[in-house]
Amino acid sequence: PNVRWEYCNLTQCSDAEGTAVAPPNVTPVPSLEAPSEQAPTEQRPGVQECYHGNGQSYRGTYFTTVTGRTCQAWSSMTPHSHSRTPENYPNGGLIRNYCRNPDPVAAPYCYTMDPNVRWEYCNLTQCSDAEGIAVTPLTVTPVPSLEAPSKQAPTEQRPGVQECYHGNGQSYRGTYFTTVTGRTCQAWSSMTPHSHSRTPENYPNGGLIRNYCRNPDPVAAPYCYTMDPNVRWEYCNLTQCSDAEGTAVAPPNVTPVPSLEAPSEQAPTEQRSGVQECYHGNGQSYRGTYFTTVTGRTCQAWSSMKPHSHSRTPENYPNGGLIRNYCRNPDPVAAPYCYTMDPNVRWEYCNLTQCSDAEGTAVAPPNVTPVPSLEAPSEQAPTEQRLGVQECYHSNGQSYRGTYFTTVTGRTCQAWSSMTPHSHSRTPENYPNAGLVKNYCRNPDPVAAPWCYTTDPSVRWEYCNLTRCSDAEGTAVMPPNIIPVPSLEAFLEQEPTEETPGVQECYYHYGQSYRGTYSTTVTGRTCQAWSSMTPHQHSRTPKNYPNAGLTRNYCRNPDAEIRPWCYTMDPSVRWEYCNLTQCLVTESSVLETLTVVPDPSTQASSEEAPTEQSPEVQDCYHGDGQSYRGSFSTTVTGRTCQSWSSMTPHWHQRTTEYYPDGGLTRNYCRNPDAEIRPWCYTMDPSVRWEYCNLTQCPVTESSVLATSMAVSEQAPMEQSPGVQDCYHGDGQSYRGSFSTTVTGRICQSWSSMTPHWHQRTIEYYPNGGLTKNYCRNPDAEIRPWCYTMDPRVRWEYCNLTQCVVMESSVLATPMVVPVPSREVPSEEAPTENSPGVQDCYQGDGQSYRGTFSTTITGRTCQSWLSMTPHRHRRIPLRYPNAGLTRNYCRNRDAEIRPWCYTMDPSVRWEYCNLTQCPVTESSVLTTPTVVPVPSTEAPSEQAPPEKSPVVQDCYHGDGQSYRGTSSTTVTGRNCQSWSSMIPHWHQRTPENYPNAGLTRNYCRNPDSGKHPWCYTTDPCVRWEYCNLTQCSETESGVLETPTVVPVPSMEAHSEAAPTEQTPVVQQCYHGNGQSYRGTFSTTVTGRTCQSWSSMTPHQHKRTPENHPNDDLTMNYCRNPDADTGPWCFTMDPSVRREYCNLTRCSDTEGTVVTPPTVIPVPSLEAPSEQASSSFDCGKPQVEPKKCPGSIVGGCVAHPHSWPWQVSLRTRFGKHFCGGTLISPEWVLTAACCLETFSRPSFYKVILGAHQEVNLESHVQEIEVSRLFLEPIGADIALLKLSRPAIITDKVIPACLPSPNYVITAWTECYITGWGETQGTFGAGLLKEAQLHVIENTVCNHYEFLNGRVKSTELCAGHLAGGTDRCQGDNGGPVVCFDKDKYILRGITSWGPGCACPNKPGVYVRVSSFVTWIEGVMRNN
């Protein structure tokens, strides 16, 4: 739909025989289409006309612009209103929409039919006039126009009509008015969009007419201010005349009127790339007027201190030629430089080249004697070398005595005699023969290449950005003997500890045999020494792995990972794979890595608009095209390539910064990341990228190139649809490089937190193979998946197919036990079946695994992963063995035959168009058992509800006999697999405890602990007890506990887990918690507490020695400084301290509960939390349905599954609002519910009800004794009951949140109530709905709630509508599940309409009022 028509990819025959076929006369039938709309709207390039002079005499019928747009008719005012009409220009030949030049500009033009582009030049060429005759253009006398001169069309020059200027262009008086980037010039007399002082009044001799290019104040070339508000000025797209005859036009004297503009503001501020100067030697003698850096930044004036303060002033350097902002070299460095106008970049070298001095003469630089400067040596500018001025070193660089002082990442070297920012022992005194002068790169202790300490406090040292000399002549410089003075530095501290990227090694197979000296990771981090425990403690030591070659900090693979790796020196990143490539094994040798020399230029030329290739000019590429450096820039469908340096129309990361060796010049086709052939991003906004229209070169013996195998963390890349991987089982073993989802979205890198924050990182899933952005399955999902780069879609399954195994093509379906996830899978596009392909099924079709996807009425099946058009709960995650693949027909819930949901919104589901197979002895298949949970829904709607963490597994005795599949601890952490040593090394393995049932990561009790436990996947928490409760022994008796005989272990007693006595865990605290002596050690956000006696990661003064009476034991929550509640320092280096996840005790009887005495067995491991009693707050005894439907439309809750729900009623028994029980005597509701009557006697509450009208016998009805409204007018109120409610399995309070806690966006929560259901099923019964928290900033957008949501309110719902609070639900609860209980997060307050699209509900944020709530309850 986006491309109406295109020419075919055909070439014209050569007509080599000299004959040409006369085209036939084509007389088209008259068309009613408007002339400008008739298709096609472009002229064929082969039918090309030409014009003479400037085209005023042109009377042809061409009507297409240089960009292929159709011309607007001259008599039409749509889409552009104008004054070039046949009436105003009677002699202009303005017929229909033909190209014309009515007001003499450079060439014929027209207004376009594109509303976004007013006008363009026509795609015509100038006639050659080879015979020497020229047609005199017509005299066109236009009717006077009222259009402003600056508005007069046209406003661009045609690129084919190019003028030139002499010298610096001061004498130029042409009519060109387009810049080098194609922008239109602003009129010199106009102050819009840029205010300036270059006016005809101030520069009377400057020729400042209309918006023509000029050079009023002598700079390098003609320029102008632009009509783009974002770009003040640019040089014009003019070339310098060749002056081949030796004559030059003397520029006129331009005497400007004095200007008040500051020198640093004087325009222009950039040089035109075509006007390039050069310098001799190191540029000290350079006195040119260039003032642009190598990255295109404008120079700061030497006399200015903004934006950078410095000492290179004309006063301090009187002989340095420091005039205006021209490039200079006042203190001899490598080349001319300047300070920049960019506040973030202090200085850079100028974009100048060194003169060739081909004649053998060189200009002697003047002696520059600067005034003494007070600047510190490390501040002296410049701090970088110009890339074009590159030196080299011989051998390992010990003999190097050059003056280079920049590292491979562009950091400046620290002076060898300086101890700031890094203290070291490589000083001139200790290494007198090493040439440690100033901050020049050196190699004092022979390592791989010259290096230096950096001036960046976070990076100690790096190799220098030097290359090794070729030594082509066969001579090598012998490095001098360097005898350093003995150093006190430890052997392991010896620098350097990283390799230069230029010195690249490779490894074979998985790299277990690698014994090289590389010590840098894929992200450039330095490796930690294997014998060191700083910053990461570990067990991969030379002592434990004597044969693994764990020397110094070199990359190794001691434990059969997929490639060499190391621990890093970054405290926040435990380990990474090394930046090594796998050796390419051939018959005789290892292929060398391809050396790619990129274009050293970073000038603006790389930003030029892309061009198209003629079909006749066809390149070819070798191999996969990584070595291709041609200039082709057209895709296989004829689209033009986007420039690699441009982010329009497609944002990407394939830039020269990330791919410096990829040859990413202009918009040329390249293959920077090892695709199957060269490709590029396209200029079509609807097509992100395509392969280029290039062919592979014929392979000959001399044309085979070595393929680059560089491993990097480059930005992810889409896969070609033709390059498809497959995976085995559930894909946990998949290690391919596919990175595209089922909907074509690009995967987010696992190490990235943008656009989606997550915890699937290599730190938490070290064996998950989470490399780059490749599809993986780290947590036992049904197939490989990834987070997406689309901020609107968190994650999706990958576009991979399951591998076909064995000859019979039967897919092995693994037993998948998924980790519980709160993330909703994304949709997968359904497929259709060919009517001729008919399957059959056995029995009732539960065993059917075919690919049929059409119903008996011919409708297409909806994908099981999709919620469109029908929402449902039959997803692969809940039925892992039911074969719910794509949109194939299945029968996983014992229907009479296979069926599916349909793509027809009006038909929810139908049986599939399958027949039953004839029953024979060989055709009977074993039907898998798929047992759904019984439901009150219609059979066709049944779906098993999610397993709620609230209704838990249980164990008998001490849990040694437990063989369940629970794998979550009491704090919600995932268990580590018993056979894994990551992140915690241990000896509780299936081999050592063969009878203990140590399967996968399931909770077990192999060594007679108090109850089942496991090691956790959190590196900061070694082990915890599991979130299990003890079974009631009255129901089924005590199971016999098996005897577990462990294999003798060498583990020390202090390492054995668990070894301490099960602590008594206090779940609540009294007052402000100063008396709390429980063993809870987790904060409100789930972080683990830091030990009070530890100074890592946070240093503090709350130690047992300083606070001897506060019982600062281990890492237990305490309140040593009379804060508002118990707290602790956290193990997260980025979060110093937080309040603990404890609630205040109710103290309803008025007595203070004495904390129990806890006498733990001494242990080095922090204890964990014990499961609490069954009637604790937020823990219903009936499993909630957690229906994803809406209140409007009906989803009846399971009776008593939301036991804190209150029906607030009048004294006559009429329900009018909801409420939440938060303690036996207190109910929380909305203040708006109490507006009618202020007396408490008017209200009563109903507890434990499921039906609104016919109340059950167990319901509790209690009068209200007091009302408390929030004092500042928030929509929240407290009701005190006349007597305490009786807490039963049907009446349980909800838990209050921590004060001021802000719940994260997209958290799943639930609302409940008996409110208005608009006539849908289930009216009068308690209903529930799932909704998501939405950020207030999103809700406050003008298209949603337009700034009406306050910070003390939270927004939740579905922007598409369908789920919301309604009249009658006000005051009711919004609860969210957290770890093992439901927390009250909101009170239903207000919202425009009921379940309306783009109008989510608004709820009172309870955490903002916890202090007020607790104060009222405490004082009343």
Swiss-Prot record:
- Give me the gene this protein comes from: LPA
Superkingdom is Eukaryota
* One cellular component (GO) term of this entry: extracellular space
Note whether Protease occurs among the keywords: yes
**Mind listing the UniProt keywords for this protein, alphabetically?**
Atherosclerosis, Disulfide bond, Glycoprotein, Hydrolase, Kringle, Lipid transport, Protease, Repeat, Serine protease, Transport
Pfam families attached to this UniProt entry = Kringle, Trypsin
GO molecular-function terms, A-Z? endopeptidase activity; serine-type endopeptidase activity; signaling receptor binding
Disease per record? Elevated plasma concentrations of apo(a) and its naturally occurring proteolytic fragments are correlated with atherosclerosis. Homology with plasminogen kringles IV and V is thought to underlie the atherogenicity of the protein, because the fragments are competing with plasminogen for fibrin(ogen) binding.
Q: Which residues form the Kringle domain?
A: 49-127, 163-241, 277-355, 391-469, 505-583, 619-697, 725-803, 839-917, 953-1031, 1067-1145
Which species is this record about?
Answer: Macaca mulatta
The identity of this protein, by name, is: Apolipoprotein(a)
